[in-house]
Structure formats: C-alpha cells, structure tokens
C-alpha cells in the first residue's frame, strides 16, 4: 500500500514512522508551519506501541518517565492528590478498599509520593522496575526522533495546495513545489488546519470542556524534576508543569470568555511569555472517509489535561493498522462505519473522563461556577452516593477510560466521602487499619530507586545527549 502522510508535528512523524514499517510511505510537511506541541505527556500506550528502548527514547526525545499527575487545588475538600498513569494496575477490590481507607494504592503512587523514578539505584545498566509508565517529552525533539527513525521513501518539504478527488476518494494531492502525489491512503496529520478533510465535520465539546487558550511561559527558578505532571487549578482554568531532561515546560490553560491573556499574565506574576496557543475542544465525525484517515489534532482535541492527544492518536492508528491491512478494504462501508464509531466512542469516553476533573465543587470564580460536567459523569458521581462504581458501569471499548482511572480522581475530588461503604469504613477502625496497612505493603519501599534528577544526571553522563 502506498501511503501519503501530510503533517510534520509529533503526530505526523509518529504516524509516518509506524506506517513506514509496514507500507510504502512518503511524508509531506514544511518547517514554515510551526509545531503546536509545547512539551507533552504520554500514557503507557506510547511505550507499548513502539516497543523501543526507553533509554534511547529518553535520549532522543529529551524525555523523562511520567508515573502520573499531581492535582493541586481542584476541589473544595482536598488540597492535592495523585493519580497514577493509566489508573491503578491491581485487582479491583484493592482499588476500592484502599481508596476508601487511605488513598489509591500501587507502586506508582508510592514512587510519586516519594518523588522517585521507577529506575533502580546502583545498577550497571539503567533498569526499569515497572515499565507501565508514560513519558514527559519535548514535542520538537520527539518529531525529529521519529523522523530520523522512519523508513520513509521520501520527505517533501512542501505545502498542499490542492486535493483531487474522484467519487469521494482522494486520487492525488498537489504541492506548492509542483509535485503531484498519488497514493492508496492519505493520512491527514496537518493539525488544526485539516487540509485533507472537511472542516465543517465537527462535534463540539466546549459545553463541557470550555478552556480554549493556553499561554506557555518560563520562570526564573525551576523546581526539582518530579515523576509526574503538576496540574494546579487557577482562577480561569489550570496550569501545568512538565519536566523534560533539559527544561520544565509550563503553561496556563484558560477560557477567553472569562479572562484575557493580560489577566492570565497578571495572575502568574513574574514570568516570561513564550507563546500563545488557541484550540477548540471537539472531534470530527468521520475519522476515516474512504481513503482519507485523520489522526492527531486533525481528528480532534480535548484539552491538555491527562495527555489525551498522543494516546488517542495511537489507539486510532493501531486499530486502523490491524483492521485495514490492504487498500481494497477502503470500499467496505460497514468497516468504515465501525471504525468511525470506535473512534467517536473513544473520544467521547475521554471527554467524559476529562470532564470529571472539573466536578470538585470549586466556586471561587465564575469559570468554576459555570463549568458543567457530562451526563455520564453526573451518573457516576450520583452512583457513588449509593455504592462504589464497578467495571460494568463504564463503556466497553478497547482503550476507553475504565474504572481504574476514574477511582483516584473520584477519591481525590471527595466523591467517595458520601459513599455508604466509606461511612462504614470510617466507623470500623479494624477494617480501616487493615486496608491502610495493605496499601502500605503493596506500595513497597522506594529507597533503592533513583530520583528523576538523579536519573537525568545518569543519562547525561552516558554522553548521548
């Protein structure tokens, strides 16, 4: 199959690398169009899909391990809480009872609490104890990393000026260099410009995910690097801190209905603005339209919280690669409908999960007073007043957000406080002591693990920066 990928950002070169392993692939992108990424996070899916040496990836992407997220000031009941990457990888009843008795449980939680990486001290090689982790990456270096690794036939440094179609299928694209490229599959990774697909094909999420702007900034002082993204609720949205090997990316995500950029910079104080980013939360309706596949920001965007963009791209890409081994299947309308439904449900499931984070009951500004949560989130929160959510309460879709990811957020925002089982625990001291001890045992001891800064120093000392 001959594949033409349009786009040169993180998604564009990540997709080009993946598809070039199994198909004849060319890439069309230009440095004149800047990369949107400002420092990003991934989920465990990233390492799972690419199966590369994590140390090699940390070198090439300026990356460090990400074990989860620390949330500060997201509710009126709790100041801060930790949420492990991809939920809590343990049996369901552990999740339930340790949440009720103490906090979410797992090695990730303990490592984050002690601000350690998942790499051992005093080992001749950098050995990872627990490989279910994401990464904090530099978007620019990640794009270049995959570009260098790709088995691409040719890279066209050009812009698309015309898309030629016949009976709804793309037959060729014309470039500003005069080149005309034909292909069996055309992949749109052109970001918000969506040069290959219909810009009117849009499902809006802004009713529940109202943030639509971000200011990226620097500060004079840097905190120690930690194994998590720091997400802090603010007056008009929230700020992030993402530690990579050579810098700590920072930004303020907000809604321009409630604040101007000047308001944001005033609240932040003594910072240096790097760039501004505009975005819309939502998705397209047709992710696959005959022989045109949309991935990355071209297919949709929720908001920066929970590192959804790269995760969704990989879920869509992997499903497509397994489902469409040959180009003759592009004419199968049932397969196309099933793929589009899968991608739509995947995005909607992630929208619900991100919406959950805004349910902590904050009312200190108009932004927090006005923000709404989705119908599904309302249902789950209502359920916690009667019983604990179970796995069957969540959508059955590969890659969708499961109970394991919801529980730490529900606990951290205080939604378990009104659960009858929690109230029983609060009066049953023996059960409380038992499950707190089990949580401590399950988390283990972290004294033989490197801090993130120690890990970073070791990577630098290897001389491959």
Question: What is the predicted function of each stretch?
Answer:
Residues 14, 18, 45, 141, ...:
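Short amphipathic alpha-helical face segments that pack within enzyme cores
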Residues 29-32, 222, 247-248, 299-302:
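A short, flexible beta-alpha/helix-coil linker loop
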Residues 245-247, 254-358:
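FAD/FMN-dependent oxidoreductases across multiple families
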Residues 20-38:
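Glycine-rich FAD pyrophosphate-binding loop
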Residues 131-264, 317:
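Predominantly flavin-linked oxidoreductase catalytic cores and closely associated redox partners
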């Amino acid at each position: 199959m001959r594949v033409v990928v349009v786009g040169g950002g993180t998604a564009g070169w990540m997709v080009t690398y993946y598809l070039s392993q199994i198909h004849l692939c060319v890439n069309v992108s230009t440095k004149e169009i800047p990369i949107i990424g400002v420092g990003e996070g991934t989920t465990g899916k990233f390492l799972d899909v690419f199966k590369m040496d994590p140390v090699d990836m940390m070198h090439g992407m300026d990356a460090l391990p990400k074990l989860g997220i620390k949330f500060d000031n997201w509710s009126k009941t709790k100041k801060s809480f930790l949420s492990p990457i991809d939920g809590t990888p343990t049996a369901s009843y552990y999740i339930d009872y340790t949440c009720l008795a103490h906090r979410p449980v797992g090695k990730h939680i303990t490592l984050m609490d002690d601000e350690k990486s998942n790499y051992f001290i005093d080992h001749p090689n950098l050995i990872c104890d627990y490989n279910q982790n994401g990464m904090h990456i530099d978007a620019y270096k990640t794009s270049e990393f995959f570009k260098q690794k790709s088995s691409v036939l040719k890279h066209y440094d050009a812009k698309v000026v015309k898309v030629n179609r016949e009976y709804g299928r793309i037959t060729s694209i014309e470039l500003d260099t005069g080149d005309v490229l034909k292909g069996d599959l055309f992949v749109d990774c052109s970001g918000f410009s969506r040069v290959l697909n219909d810009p009117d094909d849009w499902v809006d999420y802004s009713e529940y995910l109202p943030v639509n702007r971000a200011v990226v900034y620097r500060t004079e002082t840097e905190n120690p690097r930690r194994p998590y993204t720091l997400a802090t609720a603010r007056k008009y949205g929230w700020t992030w801190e993402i530690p990579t090997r050579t810098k700590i990316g920072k930004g303020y995500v907000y809604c321009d209905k409630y604040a101007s950029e000047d308001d944001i910079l005033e609240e932040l104080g003594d910072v240096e603005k790097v760039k501004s980013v505009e975005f819309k939360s939502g998705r397209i309706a047709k992710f696959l339209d005959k022989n045109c596949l949309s991935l990355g920001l071209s297919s949709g965007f929720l908001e920066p919280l929970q590192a959804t963009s790269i995760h969704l791209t990989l879920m869509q890409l992997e499903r497509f690669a397994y489902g469409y081994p040959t180009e003759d299947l592009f004419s199968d309308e049932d397969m196309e409908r099933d793929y589009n439904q899968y991608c739509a449900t995947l995005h909607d499931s992630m929208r619900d999960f991100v919406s959950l984070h805004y349910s902590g009951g904050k009312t200190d500004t108009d932004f927090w007073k006005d923000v709404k949560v989705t119908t599904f989130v309302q249902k789950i929160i209502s359920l916690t007043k009667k019983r604990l959510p179970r796995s069957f309460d969540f959508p059955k879709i590969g890659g969708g957000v499961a109970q394991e990811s919801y529980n730490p957020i529900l606990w951290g925002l205080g939604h378990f406080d009104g659960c009858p089982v929690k109230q029983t625990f609060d009066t049953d001291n023996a059960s409380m002591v038992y499950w707190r001890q089990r949580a401590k045992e399950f988390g283990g001891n972290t004294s033989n693990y490197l801090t993130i800064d120690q890990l970073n120093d070791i990577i630098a000392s290897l001389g491959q920066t």
